């Protein structure tokens, strides 16, 4: 009888599947549960590579996303999984990005370093990131943009830093770049090198808002579709500053000190659809609106406009070749709404699209 029981037990063991160790932490926990100490274990340790990548201490890892945000880290964690595609390090206390911090992260697509204390980035820190597309550096202490950014980069956001210079060299070879965000930096016009953005052939969106620039940056790429320069100290819009921007669809110049827009400026942006010039010091409606074929939204509220001509917005008669306006704002200007001829807005899509009001 005893022999029969032993035989059945041996058979059951032989039918069981092979033991599979799930991870290093499982291995350690099983030791604790069983009371087995190092002296009781065979001297051969498991190959760590077979156990798979280990998530950095206190971070969370899931589906090639490594989240190490809000941990009070003062440096980039070591031994990041090499298959990581998104690394989130925001809201920490990192002060410096060093060479080797991102070694072996050849598959990283997105790097989030927002809201740290970074003041220095080594020139070769991003060199290993051969597939990086999105780099978020906002809310740090950078005085310049990093050098040798990956040529695969498509989106760079570095607002709310201490950047005073934008050199053309930092963007050399970045032919895939689409979005550049540099708002809320102590930038001056003299700090932006002429043609700094010109080499980026696919650049579509630039935002340099809430800085100290007094002019529109020169040498902007013709691929640009949106230009946001709100909240600066620009005093005038020269026709030459927008020359060649044939694809520009949205121009944001709100909250500046603009008193004049040169004649011919709008002719240099033939596909413009939205023009934001509210909260400036304009004394008249910019010229060229009536002749512009595609423009549909014009914000001119909170200016010093004292008169509006009957042909300021629409061409004489009813020109069906011009797109109808879907939004025109003129409130908070000295001009009284009853002084404006009803025919002035003959090319507006609906009357509700017109915003008029008394001057305060």
Curated annotation (Swiss-Prot):
Its main location: secreted. GO terms for biological process: negative regulation of angiogenesis; negative regulation of endothelial cell migration; negative regulation of vascular endothelial growth factor signaling pathway; positive regulation of macroautophagy; positive regulation of mitochondrial depolarization; positive regulation of mitochondrial fission; positive regulation of phosphatidylinositol 3-kinase/protein kinase B signal transduction; positive regulation of transcription by RNA polymerase II. Residues 1-16 form the signal peptide. One of its GO terms (molecular function) is extracellular matrix binding. PROSITE patterns: LRR. Disulfide bonds join 55-61, 59-68, 314-347. GO terms for cellular component: extracellular space. Residues 17-30 form a propeptide. Belongs to the small leucine-rich proteoglycan (SLRP) family. SLRP class I subfamily. May affect the rate of fibrils formation. This is Decorin.
């Amino acid at each position: 009888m005893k022999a029969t029981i032993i035989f059945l037990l041996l058979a059951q063991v032989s039918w069981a599947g092979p033991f599979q160790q799930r991870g290093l932490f499982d291995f350690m926990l099983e030791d604790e549960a069983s009371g087995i100490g190092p002296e009781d274990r065979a001297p051969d340790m498991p190959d760590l590579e077979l156990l798979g990548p280990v998530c950095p201490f206190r971070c969370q890892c899931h589906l090639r996303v490594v989240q190490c945000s809000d941990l009070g880290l003062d440096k980039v964690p070591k031994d990041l999984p090499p298959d990581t595609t998104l690394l989130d390090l925001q809201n920490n206390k990192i002060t410096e990005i060093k060479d080797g911090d991102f070694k072996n992260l050849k598959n990283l697509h997105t790097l989030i370093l927002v809201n740290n204390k970074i003041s220095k980035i080594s020139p070769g820190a991003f060199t290993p990131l051969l597939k990086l597309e999105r780099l978020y550096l906002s809310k740090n202490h950078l005085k310049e943009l990093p050098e040798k950014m990956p040529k695969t980069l498509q989106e760079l956001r570095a607002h709310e830093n201490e950047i005073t210079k934008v050199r053309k060299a930092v963007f050399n070879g970045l032919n895939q770049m689409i979005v550049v965000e540099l708002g809320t930096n102590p930038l001056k016009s003299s700090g932006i090198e002429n043609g700094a953005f010109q080499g980026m052939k696919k650049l579509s969106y630039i935002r340099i808002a809430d800085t100290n620039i007094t002019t529109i940056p020169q040498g902007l790429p013709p691929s640009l579709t949106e230009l946001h320069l709100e909240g600066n100290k620009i005093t005038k819009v020269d026709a030459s500053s927008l020359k060649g921007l044939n694809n520009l669809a949205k121009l944001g110049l709100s909250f500046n000190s603009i008193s004049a827009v040169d004649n011919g400026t709008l002719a240099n942006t033939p596909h413009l659809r939205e023009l934001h010039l509210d909260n400036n010091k304009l004394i008249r409606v910019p010229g060229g609106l009536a002749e512009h074929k595609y423009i549909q939204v014009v914000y001119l509220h909170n200016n010093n406009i004292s008169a509006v001509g009957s042909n300021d917005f629409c061409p004489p008669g009813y020109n069906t070749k011009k797109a109808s306006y879907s939004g025109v704002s003129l409130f908070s200007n000295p001009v009284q709404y009853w002084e404006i001829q009803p025919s002035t807005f003959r090319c507006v899509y609906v009357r509700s699209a017109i915003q008029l009001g008394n001057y305060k």
